């Protein structure tokens, strides 16, 4: 399509890393296309970072034509949905070519629904030649909304713990940045005058998680 910018990379690891950075910077799902099983394997090192960063990546991988998957012909990805696990939130190979548009739509919404994470979709090569099923255009109008809030009893217990604490500290994990809750973290720390720490091995930088300079130094906890 005219509004689709396709960027070719020399190695799947670099391509996944590029998409990861774009997804984190934009807050939108990034699309990555890998070369069958071998390309998926090459990209899984970078996919580890994407998983722990909660990056909304929609990863598609090529697959042999359907008639040749069972005989394990060259480039056949046997049991494709299992290959990227456990580094993806959802993985799938459509049972029929007509299910590909719906599966792509589900992949996009799943990657971008909290908690955000990479998803994986294996698509046989000959599926692209098949006609789309009737009504596929309605997928463009599909919207997914989610909402959640702590139970009032949980909030009351948390407030009591904070009020009773002698020297409370705030430890931030990567989801603070992934959910754009940075300002709320700053407000909470300032309200209770808490020092701020970053969880060990966090996949987000300290300045990204807690960007406001303050007297209480923001630094990572030692593992």
Map each language-model feature to its residues.
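N-terminal alpha/beta PP-like core and its mobile active-site loop of ThDP/TPP-dependent enzymes
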Residues: 1-223
């Amino acid at each position: 399509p005219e509004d689709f910018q396709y960027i070719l990379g020399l190695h799947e690891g670099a391509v996944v890393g590029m998409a990861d950075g774009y997804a984190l910077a934009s807050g939108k799902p990034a699309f990555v296309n890998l070369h069958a099983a071998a390309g998926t394997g090459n990209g899984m090192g970078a996919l580890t970072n994407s998983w722990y960063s909660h990056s909304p990546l929609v990863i598609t991988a090529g697959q042999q034509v359907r008639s040749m998957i069972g005989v394990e012909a060259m480039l056949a990805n046997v049991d494709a949905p299992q290959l990227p696990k456990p580094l993806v939130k959802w993985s799938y190979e459509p049972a029929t070519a007509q299910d590909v548009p719906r599966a792509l739509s589900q992949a996009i919404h799943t990657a971008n629904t909290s908690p955000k994470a990479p998803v994986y979709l294996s698509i046989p090569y000959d599926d692209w030649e098949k006609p789309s099923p009737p009504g596929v255009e309605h997928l463009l109008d599909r919207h997914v909304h989610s909402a959640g809030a702590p139970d009032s009893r949980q909030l009351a217990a948390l407030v009591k713990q904070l009020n009773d604490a002698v020297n409370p500290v705030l430890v931030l994990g990567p989801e603070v940045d992934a959910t754009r809750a940075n300002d709320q973290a700053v407000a909470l720390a300032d309200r209770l005058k808490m020092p701020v720490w970053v969880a060990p091995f966090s996949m987000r930088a300290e300045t990204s998680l807690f960007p406001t300079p303050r007297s209480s130094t923001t630094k990572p906890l030692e593992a």
